């Protein structure tokens, strides 16, 4: 019975997978199973077979009386190829259920695809799984191997060069017997660099006879990558750096005491670029730039600093932090005093004030929202607005009369009567303005309704009464002479 079950299982497994789907390891395993000779009463346990790629789940419910009637096996055989085992993927199992007659039930397929069991749930591969891990490096920062110098597209080039130079110097000094030749030192430096730094060391002709070869390489890197002329004029570059550091310290300002650490770091970095003899003056300048507690900290520094602590910016920063902590403690006490109950003051000594004005604090009552609304049985009358989306009507009112050319609707400027022009006015002879109009017509001028149309010209007409005055004077003289003659 067991032998027939094994034969059917192997045949069904061969039928489901096919020759094209088997790998070499699977093929060898199936051949070994078919070649084994088994007794009739021997029970087969496929899980005991020496194979890492074969997993079997077997369920047997048999009895001695009716072993042929009730026998049911659940065989799940899943095999993984060598390529899949190398990639680390988990094995997938195929379940084959055997009926009482010894046959097997073929897994159902949907639309030419594989068994529906495989489509319902797919196990995630290790590539799809998420394992939260802490980053080993700072995000956005390029990491190089131990002791290697790579300054390609780096911002902090000077720091990287200084650290690398210190490491190279330590290797050479601790192994003097191995690095007596400059060629060996250059070979070490070439293998400890990459990128443009390596190309500089490899393509430059170095002076191997005189001078320190490490110092030559470092000065060349300063010149080529930092723009500092350390190779030709190192002293001038140092002086220039000191002047820039002094200007930087003078311009530094601290407005918010919360940025004390950043301010101290920047000031200290520039201070150590100057001479140590100038440190006390720069420390006093540092303390004077700190708001709120700077004056008190400066007084303490002048009294407490002695010996080498005069040159220590760290000692000054320590005093500043102590004064800052005192202010923080005082602010905490003030917050606690606001919650202090004044009724507790009666516990101490008796009051010494009698009849004074009692100070009372205004009480603020909490406003509660009404639980009900006032019922209004009527609707508020809304204002009717007609023609909300139409053009508004023109307002009625007095309009200034328009006097077009060719019509006599204007008012005469001589008699102020509407219906005629000034040149047709009946009172033009008696009016003094009419004489002016008459003289204008004699000169060939005509009245214009729109004076600002066309070319604009201004004319001035002056009326002189000298002739009339002279005629009156002559008449007076004649009358006076006639009277004199009559008297004679």
Curated annotation (Swiss-Prot):
GO biological process: symbiont entry into host cell; viral penetration into host nucleus
SMART domains: ZnF_C2HC (SM00343)
One Pfam family this sequence matches: Caulimovir_coat_dom
Keyword Zinc-finger part of the UniProt annotation: yes
Chain span(s) of sequence motif Nuclear localization signal: 121-124
GO cellular component: host cell; host cell nucleus; T=7 icosahedral viral capsid
Biased composition (Polar residues): 134-143
Metal-binding listed as a keyword: yes
GO molecular-function terms, A-Z: nucleic acid binding; structural molecule activity; zinc ion binding
Organism: Cauliflower mosaic virus (strain CM-1841) (CaMV)
Compositionally biased intervals (Acidic residues): 80-93, 464-488
Function: Self assembles to form an icosahedral capsid, about 50 nm in diameter, nm, composed of 420 subunits of the viral capsid protein. The capsid encapsulates the genomic dsDNA. Following virus entry into host cell, provides nuclear import of the viral genome. Virus particles do not enter the nucleus, but dock at the nuclear membrane through the interaction with host importins.
Top-level taxonomic group: Viruses
Alphabetical UniProt keywords: Capsid protein, Host nucleus, Metal-binding, T=7 icosahedral capsid protein, Viral penetration into host nucleus, Virion, Virus entry into host cell, Zinc, Zinc-finger
Family to which this protein belongs: Belongs to the caulimoviridae capsid protein family.
ZnF start-end (CCHC-type): 410-427
Sequence segments annotated as region (Disordered): 80-143, 463-488
Lineage: Viruses, Riboviria, Pararnavirae, Artverviricota, Revtraviricetes
Main location group: virion
Signal peptide: none
Subcellular location: Virion; Host nucleus
Protein's name in the database: Capsid protein
């Amino acid at each position: 019975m067991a032998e027939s079950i094994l034969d059917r299982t192997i045949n069904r497994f061969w039928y489901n997978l096919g020759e094209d789907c088997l790998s070499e390891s699977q093929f060898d395993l199936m051949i070994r199973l078919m070649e084994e000779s088994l007794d009739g009463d021997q029970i087969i346990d496929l899980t005991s077979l020496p194979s890492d790629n074969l997993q079997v789940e077997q369920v047997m419910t048999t009895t001695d009386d009716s072993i042929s009637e009730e026998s049911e096996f659940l065989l799940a055989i899943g095999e993984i190829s060598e390529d899949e085992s190398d990639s680390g993927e988990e094995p997938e199992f195929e379940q084959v259920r055997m009926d009482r007659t010894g046959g097997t039930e073929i897994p159902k397929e949907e639309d030419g695809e594989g068994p529906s069991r495989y489509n319902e749930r797919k196990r995630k591969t290790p590539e799809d799984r998420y394992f939260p891990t802490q980053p080993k490096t700072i995000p956005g920062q390029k990491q190089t191997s131990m002791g290697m110098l790579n300054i390609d597209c780096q911002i902090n080039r000077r720091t990287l060069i200084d650290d690398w130079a210190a490491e190279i110097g330590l290797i050479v000094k601790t192994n003097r017997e191995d690095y007596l030749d400059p060629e060996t030192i250059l070979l070490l430096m070439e293998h400890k660099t990459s990128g443009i730094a390596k190309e500089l060391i490899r393509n430059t002709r170095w002076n191997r006879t005189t001078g320190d070869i490490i110092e030559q390489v470092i000065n060349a890197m300063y010149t080529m990558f930092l723009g500092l002329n350390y190779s030709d004029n190192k002293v001038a570059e140092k002086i220039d750096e000191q002047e820039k550091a002094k200007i930087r310290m003078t311009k530094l300002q601290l407005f918010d005491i919360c940025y004390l650490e950043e301010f101290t770091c920047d000031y200290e970095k520039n201070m150590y670029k100057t001479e140590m003899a100038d440190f006390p003056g720069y420390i006093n300048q540092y303390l004077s730039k700190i708001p709120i507690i700077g004056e008190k900290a400066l007084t303490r520094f002048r009294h407490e600093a002695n010996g080498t602590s005069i040159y220590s910016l760290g000692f000054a920063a320590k005093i500043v932090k102590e004064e800052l902590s005192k202010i923080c403690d005082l602010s905490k006490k003030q917050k606690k005093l606001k919650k202090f109950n004044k009724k507790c003051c009666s516990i101490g000594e008796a009051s010494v004030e009698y009849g004074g004005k009692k100070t009372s604090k205004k009480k603020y009552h909490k406003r509660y929202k009404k639980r009900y609304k006032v019922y209004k049985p009527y609707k508020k009358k809304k204002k009717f607005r007609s023609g909300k989306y139409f053009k508004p009507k023109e307002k009625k009112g007095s309009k200034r009369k328009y006097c077009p050319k060719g019509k006599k609707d204007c008012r005469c400027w001589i008699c102020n009567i509407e219906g005629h022009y000034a040149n047709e006015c009946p009172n033009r002879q008696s009016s003094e303005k009419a004489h002016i109009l008459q003289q204008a017509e004699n000169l060939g001028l005509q009245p214009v309704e729109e004076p600002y149309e066309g070319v604009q010209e201004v004319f001035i007409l002056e009326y002189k009464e000298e002739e009339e005055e002279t005629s009156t004077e002559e008449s007076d003289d004649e009358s006076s002479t006639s009277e004199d003659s009559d008297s004679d």
